[in-house]
Amino acid sequence: MKKVCIAIVLLLLMSASAYAENMKIRFGILPVIDTLPLQVGVQDGLFEKHGIDMELIRFASALERDTAMQAGQLDGYFGDLVATYLLINQGVPMRIALTSWRTTPGYPMFGIALSPANKDRDMGDMKGRTLGLSKSSVMEYLADKMEDHLGVNRGHFSLLEIKKIPIRLQMLMTDQVDSALLPEPLLSLARLKGGGTLATAEKLDMPLTVLCLHDKYFADDAEGYAKFIAAYKEAVQRLADSPEKYRSLMAKTCRIPKPLMSEFPVYPYPMPSLPSAAELDEVQTWMVEKGLLKVKVPDETALSPIIP
């Protein structure tokens, strides 16, 4: 009987250890190139190696992703800072874990595409012409920051609300809108199909997208956060060491159009870091000005308490 009891205790201890080593994370993503390190981490078993059972939940739209996060169906989230602050302000218990993409010269993530009829116009020519985007979102924030960077007054463009990006691209290519704010690789696709590129956000020197985790992963000495960061770092390093190895994965998971599959670059993803207090304040100041926030969210509420 004593041996049986010892065996049961050992079995329970082993089960508890296995449970502790395999932390479940349901992570909401969009099929965009910012999320490639997450895809590498899952494909190569890096999250599993660090004791995380990572499930990437793909959403067709940011609205669907945000709804799932609000409903408590997700443990983590990929998104932009504007959407992130809106969710945290609405009571979603999550924190910014790391910056997934910063604007990087030579690697545009967003830009203003020109319709075929306007492809040869410059910034001065575009004054008062339509710019398709999603208002009250990171797209409008980027448009404002790009106007500042390019030395024109805010309101240089006539903003036209076109929420769905595929429709925005279609209207651009059929000359129903003069220009459109598009993410890559659609910015390159528009140029390939006869449009132009007026400007990109690559030199704005700002965080564009972030990864967030539920508050629970920052408890108990932030063990869950540490495991997540360790796996993510390995994924970023593998992409840096052998980018071409992951071209097919990028094409499959990040919606790279067939005409661009062989030549679209594998981007140099940044090692985990947090946005600065000044960068976060700049985003929130804009959100308050636009009426998206009444008061700013404290960094102590929104940001990881630990530097990755």
What are these regions (language model features)?
Residues 21-150, 159, 178-184, 198, ...:
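Short, glycine-/small- and polar/acidic-enriched structural segments
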Residues 16-20:
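Sec/Tat signal peptide C-region and signal peptidase I cleavage site
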